[in-house]
Amino acid sequence: MSDSDPKPTAAKGAAPTSIPNSTRNPNPTPPNPNPNPNPISTPAPTPTATPSPPIASSSNNGNNSTRSTNIDTNNNTNNAFFQAQQRIAARREAREAAAAARQATQQSASRLRARIAASQSPLLRRLGTSTLSLWDTLTSREGTRPAFRVGQVDAELLDEELVELLRGQVREALRYVGGGGGGGGGGGGGGVGSGVAQDWEAEISLALRAVLFKLTVWDHDATYGAALQNLKYTDARRDGPALAPPSRWQKALYGLVTVGGRYLWAKWEDWLLEQDDGFEGPSPRVKRLARWTSALSTLHASAALVSFLVFLLHGRYRTLLDRLLRMRLAPPTSQVSREVSFEYLNRQLVWHAFTEFLLFVLPLVGINRWRRWLARTWRRTKKIMTADADGGAGDKKGEYSFLPERTCAICYRDQNSASSETELLAAASGGVVGSAQTDITNPYEAIPCGCTYCFVCLATRIEREEGEGWPCLRCGELIKECKPWNGDVLEEPQVKSSPATTKTVVFADDVKAPSDHEEEENEEEEEQQGELGENEGESSQVLVEADPDGGLNDLRPETPSVSSDQADDSRGSESEDYEAEEDGLDEDPES
């Protein structure tokens, strides 16, 4: 090749040829840090002739690993960036679609508004415009943006609770004033709210509401409940950057309706109730007034419901009166952040969960058994300490060992619960007299001590211990069983004293007509009975004491009545026996 031939290389000063991006390597290989100085490729020497040094080999391996790590890192970064770009593009497309849909909706709404505006009816135009405005408000992203609806409702509830609290305190203060109760009390008698508090209940409510209105709304443009919620009454008729307080006539009308209006309405309803006494029906005029009153109450309730629903939507006027007077509750400053503390709520939830846990666990644990075990351990420890102090001597005695046998110790403890050991010792030293309330009923004997209790008392205590034993109140033994009492009631025999006066038995016929001969026989018979009583020491006959003053007229026969013939025969035989005895007595002194 001659020197004049053009060379394939680029001319001096010419621009370098640009390589397209598609042909470029996205991951260019870094230059070799140890380039071969000889560009001519030569065969590799054999290991035996020229062995490679080990240091150079490790350096090449480290470079290769670093190169592969860099390549992986670059690939991961490129993939993450590509995914982020895809997400951004998807969001942009969704936003554009939503904007297009919103624009289409606005166009349709504008066409609907144009049709409504072109309508010839003013009522239809007004209703259509209001409906479309309400729909736009509900479907917009901002919504109605109410000013603390919950806070306004809570403020009203707090105000009512405050009035009820003050009314209850006034009732308690006037509870014992004018206890007679008056005629208009309605028969309350003696309880809370009777007397003056019940007769003047409407006036008391009027005074309380008037005082609260003066100290809250009239002076500070906010009730106590609204102040706790950081709210104040404002005049909604005035537009401006700053909130304007309500005017004096607005507050005056508000107080006149809330205080005086409630009082007058309550008195009006009471008067209507008084006209119906229950015996005779009310007059036609009163019936007509009652119907009008009921209709007015229904109308007011319906209007209040509609107003409250609108309040839930917009959050401007809490009550119907606020809407009529154009007074609304609003925070005084917009810079104050509404901070809600959940400390009380969290504490309440924790205690509620803890109580539920205890109610679930205690029946499984058996708290009564543990309590009985601790009480038994304490009694044993106390008994051991007492025995050591006394030197280990003495019999087993319970805390009610001083009671008589006929007294149930369980009934006595239930009715005379002693608060200390000193009272028990005083009762033991002073003596206890049983009563019908503490006497044993249906006696049962405890096993093994044998102490006697009422069946119901003893069986209840044993069953309550669930087989672990119940300590006897008389001796301290552990009782697990009981049985019916096998004892008897013993009565001491009463010794009859000898009669101090003379007694005799007569028949009814003899009492009616006594003769002289019979009187002599009776005297002789009395003498003989007196001698026999002195010799034998007791009489074997049933005698009736004779009345020395009244004779035998007051006597009553104790023998069965007999006929007159039997009476004559018996009287004759008795007279013969007496004569024989007299003859024998007369012959004895002579012999």
From Swiss-Prot:
It catalyses: [E2 ubiquitin-conjugating enzyme]-S-ubiquitinyl-L-cysteine + [acceptor protein]-L-cysteine = [E2 ubiquitin-conjugating enzyme]-L-cysteine + [acceptor protein]-S-ubiquitinyl-L-cysteine. GO terms for molecular function: transferase activity; zinc ion binding. It is found in: Peroxisome membrane. The chain crosses the membrane at residues 149-175, 197-222, 247-273, 284-314, 342-365. A zinc finger (RING-type) spans 408-475. InterPro entries: PEX2/10 (IPR025654), Pex_N (IPR006845). Residues 27-54 have a biased composition (Pro residues). Disulfide bonds: none annotated. This is Peroxisome assembly protein 2. It comes from Thermothelomyces thermophilus (strain ATCC 42464 / BCRC 31852 / DSM 1799). The gene is PEX2.
